[in-house]
Amino acid sequence: MNHSPLWCKITMMNEPELIQAAKHGDLEAFNTLVLAYQTIVYNTALRILGDDNLAADAAQETFISAFRALNSYRGGSFRAWLLRTVTNACYDELRRKQRRPTTRLEPDNEEGDEVETPRWLADPNASPEDLLDQAELEHAIQHCLDDLPTDFKTVVVLADIQGLDYSEVSTIIKKPLGTIKSRLARARLRMRECLQSFRELLPAAFRLEKERGI
Protein backbone atom coordinates (compact mmCIF):
# COMPACT_ATOMS: atom_id res chain seq x y z
CA MET A 1 0.00 0.00 0.00
CA ASN A 2 1.32 3.45 -0.89
CA HIS A 3 1.41 6.31 1.59
CA SER A 4 2.34 9.94 1.17
CA PRO A 5 5.95 10.90 2.02
CA LEU A 6 4.60 13.26 4.69
CA TRP A 7 2.62 10.42 6.32
CA CYS A 8 5.70 8.18 6.38
CA LYS A 9 7.89 10.96 7.76
CA ILE A 10 5.46 11.77 10.54
CA THR A 11 4.88 8.17 11.58
CA MET A 12 8.63 7.55 11.76
CA MET A 13 9.65 10.78 13.48
CA ASN A 14 7.28 12.92 15.49
CA GLU A 15 3.66 11.79 15.34
CA PRO A 16 3.35 11.31 19.14
CA GLU A 17 4.72 14.81 19.72
CA LEU A 18 2.30 16.30 17.20
CA ILE A 19 -0.63 14.51 18.82
CA GLN A 20 0.34 15.73 22.27
CA ALA A 21 0.72 19.28 21.00
CA ALA A 22 -2.65 19.10 19.25
CA LYS A 23 -4.24 17.85 22.46
CA HIS A 24 -3.05 21.08 24.08
CA GLY A 25 -4.68 23.18 21.37
CA ASP A 26 -1.79 23.58 18.93
CA LEU A 27 -3.64 24.06 15.63
CA GLU A 28 -0.45 23.99 13.57
CA ALA A 29 0.38 20.54 14.94
CA PHE A 30 -3.13 19.30 14.20
CA ASN A 31 -3.02 20.74 10.68
CA THR A 32 0.21 18.82 10.08
CA LEU A 33 -1.60 15.62 11.07
CA VAL A 34 -4.48 16.54 8.76
CA LEU A 35 -2.09 17.02 5.83
CA ALA A 36 -0.48 13.66 6.54
CA TYR A 37 -3.73 11.71 6.74
CA GLN A 38 -6.16 13.59 4.50
CA THR A 39 -5.60 11.33 1.47
CA ILE A 40 -6.03 8.12 3.47
CA VAL A 41 -9.17 9.47 5.14
CA TYR A 42 -10.69 10.77 1.91
CA ASN A 43 -9.95 7.59 -0.06
CA THR A 44 -11.51 5.46 2.67
CA ALA A 45 -14.65 7.60 2.61
CA LEU A 46 -14.77 7.54 -1.19
CA ARG A 47 -14.57 3.75 -1.31
CA ILE A 48 -17.33 3.35 1.28
CA LEU A 49 -19.64 6.08 -0.03
CA GLY A 50 -18.90 5.93 -3.77
CA ASP A 51 -19.51 9.66 -4.12
CA ASP A 52 -16.78 12.31 -4.14
CA ASN A 53 -18.94 15.05 -2.59
CA LEU A 54 -20.16 12.81 0.23
CA ALA A 55 -16.60 11.57 0.76
CA ALA A 56 -15.33 15.14 1.07
CA ASP A 57 -18.05 15.90 3.63
CA ALA A 58 -17.22 12.75 5.59
CA ALA A 59 -13.50 13.55 5.54
CA GLN A 60 -14.13 17.07 6.80
CA GLU A 61 -16.38 15.77 9.57
CA THR A 62 -13.74 13.17 10.45
CA PHE A 63 -11.11 15.77 11.23
CA ILE A 64 -13.56 18.01 13.08
CA SER A 65 -14.63 15.06 15.22
CA ALA A 66 -11.02 13.93 15.67
CA PHE A 67 -9.95 17.35 16.94
CA ARG A 68 -12.83 17.47 19.40
CA ALA A 69 -12.15 13.92 20.60
CA LEU A 70 -8.34 14.03 20.74
CA ASN A 71 -8.30 13.75 24.52
CA SER A 72 -10.03 10.37 24.20
CA TYR A 73 -7.10 9.01 22.17
CA ARG A 74 -5.08 6.81 24.51
CA GLY A 75 -2.26 5.65 22.27
CA GLY A 76 -1.90 2.81 19.80
CA SER A 77 -2.30 3.28 16.06
CA PHE A 78 -3.44 6.85 15.38
CA ARG A 79 -4.19 5.79 11.80
CA ALA A 80 -6.57 3.07 13.01
CA TRP A 81 -8.18 5.58 15.39
CA LEU A 82 -8.77 7.98 12.48
CA LEU A 83 -10.14 5.19 10.29
CA ARG A 84 -12.66 4.35 13.00
CA THR A 85 -13.67 8.02 13.03
CA VAL A 86 -14.05 8.19 9.23
CA THR A 87 -16.04 4.93 9.22
CA ASN A 88 -18.48 6.44 11.71
CA ALA A 89 -18.65 9.62 9.62
CA CYS A 90 -19.48 7.52 6.55
CA TYR A 91 -22.30 5.77 8.40
CA ASP A 92 -23.65 9.19 9.37
CA GLU A 93 -23.49 10.33 5.73
CA LEU A 94 -25.32 7.20 4.58
CA ARG A 95 -28.08 7.82 7.11
CA ARG A 96 -28.41 11.41 5.92
CA LYS A 97 -28.41 10.25 2.30
CA GLN A 98 -31.30 7.88 3.03
CA ARG A 99 -33.29 10.81 4.41
CA ARG A 100 -32.51 13.07 1.43
CA PRO A 101 -31.60 11.11 -1.75
CA THR A 102 -28.92 12.72 -3.90
CA THR A 103 -27.69 12.21 -7.44
CA ARG A 104 -24.69 9.91 -7.48
CA LEU A 105 -21.49 11.35 -8.91
CA GLU A 106 -18.84 9.13 -10.42
CA PRO A 107 -15.61 9.19 -8.41
CA ASP A 108 -12.52 10.40 -10.21
CA ASN A 109 -8.83 10.86 -9.67
CA GLU A 110 -8.22 14.07 -11.60
CA GLU A 111 -6.02 15.59 -8.89
CA GLY A 112 -3.52 12.74 -9.03
CA ASP A 113 -4.20 11.59 -5.46
CA GLU A 114 -3.54 7.97 -4.67
CA VAL A 115 -6.50 5.63 -5.12
CA GLU A 116 -5.52 2.42 -3.46
CA THR A 117 -6.68 -0.96 -4.74
CA PRO A 118 -7.33 -4.23 -2.93
CA ARG A 119 -4.18 -6.28 -2.51
CA TRP A 120 -5.60 -9.20 -4.49
CA LEU A 121 -5.81 -6.95 -7.58
CA ALA A 122 -2.36 -5.41 -7.32
CA ASP A 123 -0.29 -5.65 -10.50
CA PRO A 124 3.42 -5.27 -9.65
CA ASN A 125 4.36 -5.18 -13.36
CA ALA A 126 2.23 -2.16 -14.29
CA SER A 127 3.87 0.14 -16.84
CA PRO A 128 3.02 3.71 -17.91
CA GLU A 129 1.13 2.23 -20.86
CA ASP A 130 -1.21 0.53 -18.40
CA LEU A 131 -2.42 3.78 -16.80
CA LEU A 132 -5.63 4.00 -18.83
CA ASP A 133 -6.49 0.39 -18.08
CA GLN A 134 -5.73 1.06 -14.42
CA ALA A 135 -8.18 3.97 -14.38
CA GLU A 136 -10.87 1.75 -15.91
CA LEU A 137 -10.06 -0.93 -13.36
CA GLU A 138 -10.51 1.59 -10.55
CA HIS A 139 -14.01 2.33 -11.82
CA ALA A 140 -14.73 -1.41 -12.03
CA ILE A 141 -13.60 -1.89 -8.44
CA GLN A 142 -15.77 0.99 -7.24
CA HIS A 143 -18.73 -0.37 -9.21
CA CYS A 144 -18.38 -3.75 -7.49
CA LEU A 145 -17.87 -2.14 -4.09
CA ASP A 146 -21.05 -0.14 -4.59
CA ASP A 147 -22.95 -3.38 -5.22
CA LEU A 148 -21.96 -4.71 -1.80
CA PRO A 149 -24.06 -4.14 1.32
CA THR A 150 -22.54 -1.41 3.46
CA ASP A 151 -21.39 -3.87 6.14
CA PHE A 152 -19.50 -5.94 3.54
CA LYS A 153 -18.10 -2.89 1.77
CA THR A 154 -16.74 -1.46 5.00
CA VAL A 155 -14.71 -4.55 5.94
CA VAL A 156 -13.26 -4.78 2.41
CA VAL A 157 -12.21 -1.13 2.49
CA LEU A 158 -10.65 -1.37 5.95
CA ALA A 159 -8.96 -4.77 5.56
CA ASP A 160 -8.08 -5.07 1.87
CA ILE A 161 -7.65 -1.46 0.82
CA GLN A 162 -6.36 0.19 4.00
CA GLY A 163 -4.54 -2.94 5.17
CA LEU A 164 -5.82 -3.14 8.74
CA ASP A 165 -5.67 -6.49 10.48
CA TYR A 166 -8.82 -8.31 11.55
CA SER A 167 -8.58 -7.23 15.18
CA GLU A 168 -8.32 -3.56 14.19
CA VAL A 169 -11.35 -3.88 11.90
CA SER A 170 -13.23 -5.62 14.72
CA THR A 171 -12.47 -2.71 17.05
CA ILE A 172 -13.43 -0.08 14.49
CA ILE A 173 -16.85 -1.49 13.60
CA LYS A 174 -17.48 -3.02 17.02
CA LYS A 175 -18.21 -6.55 15.82
CA PRO A 176 -16.70 -9.89 16.94
CA LEU A 177 -13.64 -11.20 15.13
CA GLY A 178 -15.61 -14.15 13.73
CA THR A 179 -18.14 -11.77 12.21
CA ILE A 180 -15.35 -9.80 10.55
CA LYS A 181 -13.80 -12.92 9.02
CA SER A 182 -17.17 -14.18 7.79
CA ARG A 183 -18.16 -10.85 6.23
CA LEU A 184 -14.77 -10.44 4.60
CA ALA A 185 -14.80 -13.93 3.09
CA ARG A 186 -18.28 -13.40 1.65
CA ALA A 187 -17.45 -9.89 0.46
CA ARG A 188 -14.28 -11.06 -1.30
CA LEU A 189 -16.20 -13.80 -3.07
CA ARG A 190 -18.82 -11.32 -4.28
CA MET A 191 -16.12 -8.90 -5.41
CA ARG A 192 -14.38 -11.62 -7.41
CA GLU A 193 -17.64 -12.69 -9.04
CA CYS A 194 -18.58 -9.12 -9.88
CA LEU A 195 -15.16 -8.30 -11.30
CA GLN A 196 -15.41 -11.19 -13.77
CA SER A 197 -17.80 -9.00 -15.78
CA PHE A 198 -14.81 -6.66 -16.21
CA ARG A 199 -12.51 -9.58 -16.98
CA GLU A 200 -10.51 -7.83 -19.71
CA LEU A 201 -9.48 -5.11 -17.24
CA LEU A 202 -8.14 -7.48 -14.59
CA PRO A 203 -4.38 -7.91 -14.09
CA ALA A 204 -3.06 -10.99 -15.87
CA ALA A 205 -2.17 -12.74 -12.61
CA PHE A 206 -5.77 -12.49 -11.44
CA ARG A 207 -7.14 -13.84 -14.75
CA LEU A 208 -4.78 -16.81 -14.64
CA GLU A 209 -5.72 -17.45 -11.03
CA LYS A 210 -9.37 -17.64 -12.04
CA GLU A 211 -8.63 -19.93 -15.00
CA ARG A 212 -6.84 -22.37 -12.69
CA GLY A 213 -9.88 -22.38 -10.44
CA ILE A 214 -8.03 -20.89 -7.46
Question: Can you say where each PLM-predicted feature lies in the sequence?
Answer:
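Amphipathic, Lys/Arg- and hydrophobic-enriched alpha-helical face
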Residues: 34-52, 69, 145, 151, ...
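Helix-turn-helix DNA-binding module
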Residues: 13, 139-154, 158-179
